[in-house]
């Protein structure tokens, strides 16, 4: 695979290899055959980052070969959304001959939605001034005149200039309901929107007969919290990143959801609060004992759950675990399988044509 060519004819084979690999990894914990959710074979990534290469008068996006570290020119990127591909050409055309926009520009980041909105961030090794703002405003207006719903941001050391806003609003159809998700530039969002819809619908399906409340750790912008709210009396969710918490609060209001409470704290801190080890001002006014959480949802970083959180989640009758790294999932399962059994297993092909896998398990208490 190269950035400008996807081996779409190999999609089925690479997916089958992942299914076999996941089943083998999970064999010590479950004999289940994974439920498999396929990705679109192209134009599935909703965000992308590129370095810029200045070659005389020419200017173009580049990526680096993971093995050799050599530069690869990228004029089209079929893994990314159609909108990103359109913007890549338009941005180069708009920046190449404009000194204020081109000088010391070293990276462009693209974030797009299925609803055809985009935020484009230009990163510089220089101070950004009024001349830059005027040039960027003219470029933004020219892009909009082409029918592109785009917002531009300039970034430099300790500087961020938003011409109007640093977010876009995604609208995802999830099990018969449209959910609005505010996505903030430079904050985590699910890269594969089509796969995200399938993950949300799978999570809804496996929790459809739930009782009581849901506790969620690592909730981000409320991606899963908002979708799962319809299956539970209440949802209590934690997240540490301020922009993600702000986006989650907006999303709760925008979707008219009244049973989700977001707390800004790390999963490790929440574990301490639940165990009575520490008290936190951020929890004032929230009576944790009022929540009857029979299900806990975790979508941890690649490192998986730390040992204290492992112990904490074992106290819940049901654990829904989404993992972007099956190796750390299996490491966690060495502990979790002492008290719980794997009752559902799914593979989500979030990252086609790579060795990376995303998977989900539902664990029920023995």
From Swiss-Prot:
Question: Family, per the entry?
Answer: Belongs to the class I-like SAM-binding methyltransferase superfamily. RNA M5U methyltransferase family. TrmA subfamily.
Q: Which SUPFAM superfamilies match?
A: S-adenosyl-L-methionine-dependent methyltransferases
Q: Which CDD domains match?
A: AdoMet_MTases
What would be an example GO MF term here? rRNA binding
Keywords linked to the UniProt accession: Methyltransferase, S-adenosyl-L-methionine, Transferase, tRNA processing
One Gene Ontology cellular component annotation held by this UniProt entry: cytosol
* Reactions it catalyzes: uridine(54) in tRNA + S-adenosyl-L-methionine = 5-methyluridine(54) in tRNA + S-adenosyl-L-homocysteine + H(+); uridine(341) in tmRNA + S-adenosyl-L-methionine = 5-methyluridine(341) in tmRNA + S-adenosyl-L-homocysteine + H(+)
Its domain of life? Bacteria
The name this protein carries in UniProt is tRNA/tmRNA (uracil-C(5))-methyltransferase
Q: What is the role of the protein in this entry? A: Dual-specificity methyltransferase that catalyzes the formation of 5-methyluridine at position 54 (m5U54) in all tRNAs, and that of position 341 (m5U341) in tmRNA (transfer-mRNA).
């Amino acid at each position: 695979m190269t950035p400008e060519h996807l081996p779409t004819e190999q999609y089925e084979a690479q997916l089958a290899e992942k299914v076999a690999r996941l089943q083998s990894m999970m064999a010590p914990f479950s004999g289940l055959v994974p439920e498999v959710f396929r990705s679109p074979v192209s134009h599935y990534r909703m965000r992308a980052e590129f370095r810029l290469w200045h070659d005389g008068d020419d200017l173009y996006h580049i990526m680096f070969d993971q093995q050799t570290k050599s530069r690869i020119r990228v004029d089209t990127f079929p893994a990314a959304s159609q909108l990103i591909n359109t913007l890549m050409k338009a941005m180069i055309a708009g920046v190449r001959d404009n000194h204020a926009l081109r000088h010391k520009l070293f990276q462009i980041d693209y974030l797009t939605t299925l609803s055809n909105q985009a935020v484009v961030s230009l990163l510089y090794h220089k101070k950004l001034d009024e001349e830059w703002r005027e040039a960027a405003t003219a470029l933004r207006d020219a892009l909009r005149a082409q029918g592109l719903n785009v917002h531009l941001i300039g970034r430099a050391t300790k500087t961020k200039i938003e011409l109007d806003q640093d977010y876009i609003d995604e609208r995802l159809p999830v099990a018969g309901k449209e959910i609005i998700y505010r996505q903030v530039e430079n904050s985590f969002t699910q890269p594969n929107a089509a796969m995200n819809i399938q993950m949300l619908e799978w999570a809804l399906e496996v929790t459809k007969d739930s009782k009581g409340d849901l506790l969620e750790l690592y909730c981000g912008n409320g991606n899963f919290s908002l979708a799962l709210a319809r299956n539970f009396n209440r949802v209590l969710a934690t997240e540490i990143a301020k922009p993600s918490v702000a986006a989650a609060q907006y999303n709760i209001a925008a979707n008219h959801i009244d049973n989700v409470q977001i707390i800004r704290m790390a999963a490790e801190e929440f574990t301490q609060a639940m165990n009575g080890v520490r008290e936190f001002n951020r929890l004032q006014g929230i009576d944790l004992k009022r929540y009857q959480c029979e299900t806990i949802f975790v979508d941890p970083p690649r490192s998986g759950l730390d040992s204290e959180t492992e112990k904490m989640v074992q106290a819940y009758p049901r654990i829904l675990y989404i993992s972007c790294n099956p190796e750390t999932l299996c490491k966690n399962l060495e502990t979790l399988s002492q008290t719980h059994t794997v009752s559902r297993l799914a593979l989500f092909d979030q990252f086609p044509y790579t060795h990376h896998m995303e998977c989900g398990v539902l664990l029920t208490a023995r």
